[in-house]
Amino acid sequence: MEEIVLNTIKKYNLINNGDKIVVAVSGGPDSMCLLNVLKNIREKFNLELFVAHINHMIREEADSETEYVKQYCEKNNIKCFVKMANVLEMAKQQKRGTEEMGRIVRYDFFNYVANKVFADKIAIAHTENDNAETVLMNLMRGASLEGLKGIEPIRGKFIRPLIECSRDEIEAYCEENKLDPKFDKTNNDNIYTRNKIRNLLIPYIKKEFNPNIVESLNRLAVLARQDAKYFSEIVKNEYKNLVIFENVNKEKHNIIDKNTNIGTSQEENENQKNGDITELNDINKTNIKETVEQQIILDLKKFNKLEYVIKSRVLLYTINKLLGTTKGIEKINVEDMIKLCEKNIGNKYLIPNKNVKIFIKKGKVFFIKL
């Protein structure tokens, strides 16, 4: 097991000598395996380890799991940070699903601890099986190449040293090392989509179609990541060729023509429907001076010469650069944006996710952050 993890660390350059690492630990087999492996190799890499544990206050066993994690850390001289979070109440207040709320709370806490101890990395115990489940779930949703990448071994500060380890290998390691991890019984409840995929769909595929489906899905994820990386480089280069003006900071630049109304009233925002192309009211008649904080402008003529597959990626890249996310942007929104550009529709605009306004003016494509 430790050899597999060391190979993964080397392959993806997950850890550097002297790193401070926050390990996300629930007390289950995956996270306890991860913590124990990192504990065993910490001298090899001169690591400083910290544990971040959240008690979601949902299950009766939660308190005993918290105590178990604290005792392990005390025994092995690892500083442990614990957060008590009433996830059910928080989800109710914020009108979110319990799963979503739990994830938000966890990652907020991991980042908080990382900032507090000046950590270089945050280690998450995602496994080969988790990755297979994610790829299959995204595939069924009709995901693009990005969705087929699955769970990446490294993304920013977050590293996943167990991503090439199977769940069977992890449970065997826990037994061999007498870790006595705590099992979350809710993982057996086939209520959530992921649990259904894990407990019902993948075992069925293994039995009836492909006994190596987990390995196959992980191989697909690797290939998708390779292809996505190739496209990413192409898109970055095309963006550099297309961009006329870029201000993604909060410094103000008054560069819009004075007779271009780029303002959007609150009433207009409330009436927008995702994907709709809406008339830009009096775009050539309004004589106002407007200062725009954050925006990107692309060359329309050059954009329209691109292949469709690159156009869609350039649009998403541009929006992500402006907003820091493409959440809420669906396939139909991308199609509408391309249509707006190809037909050079100069008296209409799009607000695809209520956070960005897109329109054409004098041979340019404007992306305005709202």
Spans of features found by a protein language model:
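AMP-forming adenylation/ATP pyrophosphatase catalytic core
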Residues: 2-30, 42, 48-50, 105, ...
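Hydrophobic/aromatic residues within well-ordered alpha-helical segments
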Residues: 65, 106, 166, 197, ...
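Alpha-helix boundary/capping and short turn/kink residues
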Residues: 141, 145, 207-214, 229, ...
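Core alpha/beta nucleotide-donor-binding catalytic domains of modification enzymes
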Residues: 1-25, 29-202
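Mid-to-C-terminal catalytic subdomains of enzymes
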Residues: 177-215, 222, 355-356, 363, ...
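Non-catalytic, surface-exposed connector residues within folded enzymatic/regulatory domains
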Residues: 63, 92, 191, 211-214, ...
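Non-catalytic, well-ordered alpha-helical scaffold segments
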Residues: 32, 133-134, 195, 199, ...
